């Protein structure tokens, strides 16, 4: 079926996957200006190789060496899948008349959503106006990217209930102590 896809990914085996798909002759890729293949397009192609979205998402996560977190919008709902090792987050927000899913918790604060929960590693859920349903239970192995707190994350964001701003403050204190300040 038709869907819209957003990804946060680091695909270490992108060249191998692309070559394998091209050899099968089942698709073609559009190149970006630098001549590279778009990672989101590759993920969509992997998903489409299976009979349904859930199998396709799991297949893409299994085949990719690296990290893949995604949001996939269909007429039936918004499918959310966190990286199998939890490297990058998916946060669910809620308010009286609905739900949202974002990659960073501060994204919906001005829209009057409140934190509902973060998906666990490898968890797949679907959001509809009626609620959030877990389709694949979360795993136990969490390896969240530490750069979220010290580099990438917006200061007002929280990951696994740890504030980016507070983490940076504490890191600064530790560096100052180490350097004798």
Predicted regions and their residues:
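Conserved short alpha-helical segments that host acidic/polar catalytic motifs at enzyme active sites
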Residues: 1-121, 126-181
């Amino acid at each position: 079926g038709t869907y819209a896809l957003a990804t946060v990914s680091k695909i270490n085996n992108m060249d191998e996957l692309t070559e394998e798909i091209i050899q099968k002759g089942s698709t073609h890729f559009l190149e970006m200006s630098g001549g590279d293949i778009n990672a989101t397009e590759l993920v969509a192609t992997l998903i489409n190789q299976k009979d349904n979205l859930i199998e396709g998402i799991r297949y893409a996560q299994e085949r990719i060496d690296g990290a893949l977190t995604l949001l996939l919008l269909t007429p039936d709902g918004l499918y959310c899948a966190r990286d199998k090792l939890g490297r990058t987050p998916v946060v669910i927000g809620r308010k009286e008349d609905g739900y949202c899913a974002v990659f960073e918790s501060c994204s919906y604060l001005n829209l009057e959503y409140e934190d509902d929960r973060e998906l666990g590693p490898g968890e797949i859920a679907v959001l509809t106006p009626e609620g959030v349903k877990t389709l694949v239970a979360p795993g136990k192995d969490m390896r969240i990217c530490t750069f979220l707190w010290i580099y990438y994350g917006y200061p007002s964001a929280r990951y696994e209930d740890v504030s980016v701003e507070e983490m940076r403050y504490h890191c600064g204190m530790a560096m100052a102590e180490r350097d004798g300040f």
